[in-house]
Amino acid sequence: RSRADRRRAKEEPRTEKRPLGPELEVVETQVFRGPNYWSYDPAIRLLVDLGSLEDWPSNTIPGFVDGLLEMLPGIPEHSCSLGRRGGFGERLKEGTWLGHVAEHIALELQRESGAHVYRGKTRSAGEPGRYNVIYGYWEERVGLAAGDLAVRLVNQLVEPAKDFDFLVELERLILLAERRAFGPSTQAIVDEAASRDIPWIRLNEASLVQLGWGKYQQRVRATMTSKTSALAVDIAGDKDVTRRLLASAGLPVPRGELVLNEDDAVRAATAIGFPVVTKPLDGN
């Protein structure tokens, strides 16, 4: 929509008291693990559809801004496009679109969990009500979880649901970030690689990390490097890591999933499709 349309949406009086419902939804998700179309830094892109919320900027929804500031008191301090501290708080009060709000929530949630991420942007996807929401991340799974929670929080502020407890959801995100955090040795290596502009990616749920690309790549786990055969032996002994690494290289591997209990095993088998084979993670 044009700038004039946007201005009218912010300023014109409303005949309806509230939006039709919490209609913000994620249509597509992409993870960029290096420089990409949107950013030099790793980023997540959510293609979101606002539905009828396209006609409801933040300043037109009763209680939306106050509720958001109560749940995330640090979010109005974001600089946003105004380039100064508190800029996003001003944008919220003058009226901004809910995809843009979700972007800043995703960043703030990650900062609440201990990550230092600041960059994001929201751009029209070329269709009415659809936007590309791009935001930086430090740990991939935490970044994806933050985006999911951001969308749910926006919908909660539009129309509260009884079964949504934001503090419980935030605590789950923080616990996920703590579980996914590297140990001090691996973190020190990753930080040094980042300071030298050496790309790195996490290869498993633990501390297996690839530094560099192509023929220059090296792998480390904690302080053990791929210069020794011990690391290869450990990887080969872990069926899940081996399967994931082979699949990421484009080699054919059977579908599989790591499970820890009977209920998860039944769910995974149903998703994969019978017949299935069960094997211990490490051993034969």
Segments from the language model and where they lie:
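Short aromatic/hydrophobic-glycine micro-motifs
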Residues: G74-C80, A115, D197-P199, L251, ...
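Glycine-rich loop at the start of a catalytic domain that most often binds anionic cofactors/ligands
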Residues: G212-Q218
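Long, compositionally biased, glycine/small-hydrophobic-enriched stretches that function as flexible linkers
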Residues: R6, E12-E171, L176-E178
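Hydrophobic alpha-helical hairpins/lids featuring a short glycine-rich hinge
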Residues: R179-F182, A194
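Domain-scale recognition of functional cores that engage charged ligands
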Residues: G183-I189, E262-A265
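Structured, non-catalytic alpha/beta "coupling" segments that mediate domain-domain communication
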Residues: I189-L208
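Extracytoplasmic/secretory soluble proteins
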Residues: A206-G212, A230
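Active-site nucleotide/adenylate-binding loops and adjacent lid/helix of ATP-dependent enzymes
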Residues: E16-K17, Q30, P62, Q218-N284
